[in-house]
A protein has these predicted regions:
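Aromatic pocket-lining residues of Rossmann-like dinucleotide-binding sites
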Residues: 24-25, 85
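Amphipathic, non-transmembrane alpha-helical scaffold segments
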Residues: 14, 57, 146-150
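Phosphate/diphosphate ligand-binding glycine-rich loop within oxidoreductases
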Residues: 1-5, 97, 133, 139
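Glycine-rich NAD(P)-binding loop of Rossmann-like domains
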Residues: 1-20
Length: 173
């Protein structure tokens, strides 16, 4: 492996989670670059923003994905984007499985273009493949995370009752 201090982390999606990842990585000495439609106020780390993901990944040792699954983001990590990445880059996908084209990830790992692909969303096509690190999807399975979800639900309900605001809806346009 290599040290991460001084390396560049590119974050695709600087919402609440992406911003926290950026702050933590910066605290560990990483340089942060980003591409995001919206930047969450949690972001306190210095972050050079790129309008074009293909340009951003050219400078990244690591690329971390934190975007929702939308028509515009499905398959965004594909052979064309990977071709723009530094040789030996590492891709981290802890967001959604359909953001990557699995065949393109496997081909890039086999050719050495990518050094690693890390995910907690792997299906059987990716498990036990060389260069793939797969962990269980347990990020929200802590006591604190459950407490935070309950607190957020209460806050959102109160905001709706008191002000008519609907945020973070999964079924309201």
């Amino acid at each position: 492996g290599t040290e991460i201090e001084g390396k560049t982390l590119g974050i695709i999606g600087l919402g609440a989670i992406g911003a926290k990842v950026a702050n933590a990585a910066h605290a560990l000495g990483m340089n942060i670059v980003g591409n995001s439609v919206v930047v969450h106020p949690f972001l306190t780390a210095p972050c050079k923003m790129y309008d074009d993901v293909a340009e951003m990944v050219k400078v990244c040792d690591y690329v971390s994905i934190h975007v929702p699954s939308l028509p515009a983001t499905k398959g965004m990590i594909n052979k064309d984007l990977i071709a723009n990445m530094k040789d030996g880059a590492i891709v981290l996908n802890y967001a959604r499985p359909d953001l990557v084209v699995e065949e393109d990830i496997i081909a890039a790992l086999e050719s050495g273009k990518l050094r690693k692909y890390m995910t907690d969303l792997a299906d059987e096509n990716l498990i036990n493949k060389p260069g793939i690190v797969s962990t269980p999807h347990l990020g929200a399975s802590t006591k604190e995370a459950e407490d935070n979800c309950a607190s957020m639900a209460v806050d959102e309900l109160m905001d709706y009752i008191e002000n008519g605001n609907i945020r973070n809806s999964v079924n309201f346009p």
